[in-house]
Regions:
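Catalytic core of nucleotide-sugar-dependent glycosyltransferases
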Residues: 220-226, 232-260, 271-306
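Short, well-formed alpha-helical segments that are part of the catalytic scaffolds
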Residues: 31-45
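A conserved acidic beta->alpha catalytic loop
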Residues: 57-68
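Cell-envelope/extracellular polymer assembly enzymes that use nucleotide-activated donors
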Residues: 21-23, 42, 52, 201
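Short aromatic/hydrophobic "clamp" motif used to bind/position activated sugar donors
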Residues: 105
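Donor-binding/catalytic cores of nucleotide-activated saccharide
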Residues: 110-216, 221-238, 249
Length: 357
């Protein structure tokens, strides 16, 4: 792999100083070396001279910081490294954004990786078309690289996106590449202070404010799903973080923007708060009644007519039986069914072990 790095370095020997096309900002916090290595190696591409990489160590323990710095020292990539006091992922992204110099900015997670060939083609699209926001496709993989889900939302090499549709799919900052100058001057801030929902709150607010987006069918991003993620094991203090994130998003938006995209914001609340947040409570906090009640009260206060939302009729996820139970207030029944399912799995496991013996 070192030979590959050297080959690309020689193809892109530094010339005169100029603005690079893309700044890639990667926050890291106690990231395992094996993930970080794969992340960095995936950024090797033929247009390496168009990229700067900004690593922001968000207060990692020294053993992890040391491994990260050694990986950076052994790389021929153009990398800037900063270490700061722990403040959360968006705090680290904001720090990196302040040090970025590229025309565009791309927020990555340190345990994910990209397709280097797709990255080359996307850089070419950015230089040719100069969009403010460019969305792309992605997949979800195991740490071993096996594909779990494929999300091919966008068709065509380069197309204008209907913003109402774009809002439905802007729940992560790493799903889009942004014009850095427009992003910084938009008045939209990276939402902080929550563990869950900060991506959705920021990305959605920015798209709604700017009102323009383009897409490509390139599958650029490989999202790694592993047991250590915040969404897999959310701490109990984050149980209602999504409500706070949503409120932070709405506070950043003009009333005219909220009115224009009311149906989309209402649907996002139904999806992320009523459904996903309720499922997290059922799965991780044993169906805590107070949390469930808080979610129901929030929905009815902020979107009193949510049951009439048009997306409930058109989005496929709204047809799932778990979604229907939650929508109709049958969370206790769903919790009992989930608990029964767990017990059945345990019983089947015991029977299986006895059969093997």
């Amino acid at each position: 792999m070192l030979a590959r790095e050297l080959q690309i370095f020689l193809l892109n020997k530094p010339g005169e100083m100029r603005m690079k096309t893309l700044s890639i900002i990667i926050p890291t916090y106690n990231t395992l070396k094996i993930y970080f290595q794969k992340c960095l190696l995936s950024l090797l591409c033929e247009q390496q001279n168009e990229i700067e990489i900004i690593i922001v160590d968000d207060g990692s323990q020294e053993q992890y910081s040391g491994e990260i710095k050694r990986e950076i020292e052994n790389s021929l990539l153009d990398i800037k490294y900063y270490k700061k006091k722990n403040g959360g992922q968006n705090s680290a992204r904001e720090y990196g954004l302040a040090h970025a110099t590229g025309k565009y900015v791309f927020f990555m997670d340190a345990d994910d990786y990209v397709d280097s060939n797709a990255l080359d083609r996307i850089i070419s699209l950015l230089k040719k078309h100069k969009p403010i926001i460019l969305a792309f496709n992605y997949d979800v993989r195991t740490p071993d690289g096996n594909i779990i889900e494929e999300h091919n939302r966008w068709k065509g090499e380069y197309k204008k996106v209907n913003v109402t549709r774009g809002l439905l799919y802007s729940d992560s900052l790493w799903l889009q590449i942004y014009d850095r100058d427009v992003f910084c001057k938009s008045g939209i801030h990276l939402v902080q202070g929550v563990r869950i929902g900060e991506d959705m709150a920021t990305a959605t607010a920015f798209l709604a404010t700017i009102g323009t987006e383009y897409s490509t069918d390139e599958c650029l991003y490989h999202y790694i799903k592993h047991p250590g993620s915040a969404l897999s094991n959310p701490p109990e203090e984050s149980a209602l973080d999504m409500l706070q994130a949503f409120e932070a998003m709405l506070k950043q938006l003009d009333i005219s923007v909220q009115t224009k995209y009311y149906a989309e914001f209402e649907w996002l609340a139904i999806l992320h708060i009523l459904y996903y947040n309720t499922m997290r409570v059922l799965t991780n906090y044993r169906g805590n009644v107070e949390y469930i009640k808080a979610i129901e009260v929030w929905m009815n206060e902020n979107f009193p007519n949510w049951r009439e939302n048009s997306y409930l009729k058109t989005e496929s996820i709204a047809k799932k039986w778990m979604f229907v139970l939650i929508k109709n207030g049958h969370t206790k029944l769903l919790f009992d069914l989930e608990e029964a399912k767990k017990k059945i799995k345990i019983i089947l496991g015991i029977v299986s072990r006895k059969t093997i013996k």
